[in-house]
Amino acid sequence: MATLQTAKKELRRKLQKILSEVSKESVTAQSSIATRILLALPEYHAAKKLSVYLSMPSGEISTTAIVRDAFSRGKQVYVPYLYQSGPAATATATATQGRSSVMEMLALRSLEDYESLQADKWGIPTLDANTIGNRRNCLGGYGIPIPAGATAQSSASTSTRIEQSESESELESELAVDDGGSGLDLVVMPGLAFDEQLRRLGHGKGYYDHFINRLMNHGQNAGDESKTGMRKPHLVALALAEQLLPPGEEIPVADHDCPVDALIVGNGRILTSSS
């Protein structure tokens, strides 16, 4: 395990240096190419519910045009929200136990909602913590699971619906979303590096691997033996050309590391599990 972690750490350091030298113009050009390919995928057209990472201003494919297109097509768009989990959440005790930080996929209400997001210290558009309780969770309910002993009134960590404005209620009626949660059809993922076998190296926190595992086991983790988890969404990663390792080089992975179903590269390449 120590050797694996060391190999990952060294590869991350190498890629971070490479990406720091990629120009803004190159990122813009590659983002345009990758976006065009993604928007042409049958899986994208068929997806009613998708999650999209919100991109940093440099070093990765921009997802702004993807979010805009998804809303123009009437899709339901979910984005990552990271929070400190504290005590094990009641609804996902087994799933989140042992992790100090957890990623949920919460809904954007509209394009205007997306455009109103403020950037965090990394320049990533981020959901306002004060709005979390009103946002649908792709696993069901609203917001994030309530920690043991907390109340919806005293914490932003809530799966209880907070009173909405009239305009928000009208919007949700139009979307006709299932309160019970039905997972996602498509997940658009970032990464630090990829190889031609569709292995992915993240930034070291395991957020996406952990989330996909929770998604697949949702229901079982809540103690409902009649549930077998949700259908696995189609996993699509976006990468700058500099993030794809040369042929013959491989991402070091552990058993829990989840490969993607498709990798779209900013130079126009698309790698799939069936190719």
Label the model's feature ranges.
Residues A2-L175:
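N-terminal active-site beta-alpha-beta segment that forms phosphate/nucleotide-binding
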Residues M1-T6, E10, K17-E21, P125-R199, ...:
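Surface-exposed, charge/polar-rich loops and edge strands
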Residues A65, Y207-H210:
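Non-catalytic alpha-helical scaffold/packing segments enriched in small hydrophobic residues
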